[in-house]
């Protein structure tokens, strides 16, 4: 379940949005959970709205002026409307003064109050993007997520197949590590899965015989990535005896794996002695990039083969006719 607390929102956006607690002596926290928001008719964040309330209400100078001109009865009615909504936080933007009625309201209702000198539109725009990422549908998968040639590639396979060793080889060739063992995937768009690493495992790669390796320390800052959109799955499959010959040499259809209702291209690479898996992964990524541009090597070969066959057939027909 994806969730974010108001305290976390405050801490992770404090510097860029110049946030301050409106009531520093009585900081109150609340949780925003994606299943509650999905089952609600309220918008996530927006300017102060009493008719269609938001989970996070943002007050600018215009909103404060509106509240100041209300009489006591009308103001109480409006605040009661807020109290009945699923209000998670109030943010007073534009460096506007916090009305005393709002201070009293948040203390009575135990609602977090934040103030900022940043423009309200800037706050809404940035927090919409932040909350969309934090509250996106999420799932964890076992594998290694890498940035290979600018593309997010997740290497999967059963335990002991050599995922970490392959990842280490790719990192040594200049590619980047995103996550090892546990990959957190968030659906941040209709067709986009973003992968990242849990904080506990960030920068680390476990390799049998070597233990835990700090990739950032060993290879430098450019060898790790904070997050990456996953576009390709490379599945490593062990081969037994001569079973490598059983794999299709010219696959006519592309494989896809559905994760969080998003289709991700999948390539299966047989693991056998003597195969350079790092080169194969790089080739798979380059080939997929070409396919995204409309260039399919397999289909091109098939068309060339069919054209050659058609030419030979026509030539054979002409020879038979002349005889």
Swiss-Prot record:
InterPro entries (UniProt xref): HPr(Ser)_kin/Pase, Hpr_kin/Pase_C, Hpr_kin/Pase_Hpr_N, P-loop_NTPase, Ser_kin/Pase_Hpr-like_N_sf, Sigma_54_int_dom_ATP-bd_1
Keyword Signal: no
Important for the catalytic mechanism of dephosphorylation, as annotated region: 270-275
Cofactor list: Mg(2+)
Cross-referenced CDD domains: HprK_C
Binding annotation for ATP: 157-164
Function: Catalyzes the ATP- as well as the pyrophosphate-dependent phosphorylation of a specific serine residue in HPr, a phosphocarrier protein of the phosphoenolpyruvate-dependent sugar phosphotransferase system (PTS). HprK/P also catalyzes the pyrophosphate-producing, inorganic phosphate-dependent dephosphorylation (phosphorolysis) of seryl-phosphorylated HPr (P-Ser-HPr).
Quaternary structure note: Homohexamer.
Name of protein: HPr kinase/phosphorylase
Species assigned in the record: Nitrosomonas europaea (strain ATCC 19718 / CIP 103999 / KCTC 2705 / NBRC 14298)
């Amino acid at each position: 379940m994806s969730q974010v607390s108001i305290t976390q929102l405050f801490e992770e956006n404090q510097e860029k949005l110049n946030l301050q607690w409106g009531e520093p002596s009585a900081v109150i926290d609340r949780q925003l959970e994606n299943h509650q928001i999905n089952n609600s008719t309220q918008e996530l964040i927006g300017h102060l709205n009493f008719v269609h309330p938001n989970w996070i209400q943002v007050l600018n100078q215009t909103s404060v002026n509106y509240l100041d001109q209300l009489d006591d009865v009308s103001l109480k009615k409006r605040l009661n409307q807020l109290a009945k909504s699923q209000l998670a936080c109030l943010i007073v933007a534009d460096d506007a003064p916090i009305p005393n009625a709002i201070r009293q309201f948040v203390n009575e209702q135990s609602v977090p109050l934040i103030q900022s000198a940043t423009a309200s539109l800037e706050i809404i725009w940035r927090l919409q993007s932040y909350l969309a990422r934090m509250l996106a549908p999420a799932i964890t998968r076992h594998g290694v997520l890498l940035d290979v040639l600018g593309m997010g590639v997740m290497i999967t396979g059963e335990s002991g197949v050599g995922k970490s060793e392959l990842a280490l080889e790719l990192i040594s060739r200049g590619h980047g590590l995103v996550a090892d063992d546990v990959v957190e995937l968030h659906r941040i768009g209709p067709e986009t899965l973003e992968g990242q690493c849990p904080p506990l495992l960030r920068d680390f790669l476990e390799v049998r015989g070597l233990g835990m390796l700090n990739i950032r320390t060993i290879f430098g800052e450019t060898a790790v990535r904070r997050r990456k959109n996953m576009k390709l799955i490379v599945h490593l499959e062990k081969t037994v005896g001569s079973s490598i010959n059983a794999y299709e040499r010219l696959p006519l259809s592309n494989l896809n794996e559905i994760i969080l209702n998003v289709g991700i291209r999948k390539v299966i690479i047989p693991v056998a002695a003597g195969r350079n898996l790092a080169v194969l992964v790089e080739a798979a990524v380059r080939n997929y990039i070409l396919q995204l541009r409309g260039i399919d090597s397999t289909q091109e070969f098939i068309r060339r083969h069919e054209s050659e066959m058609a030419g030979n057939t026509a030539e054979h027909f002409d020879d038979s006719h002349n005889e």
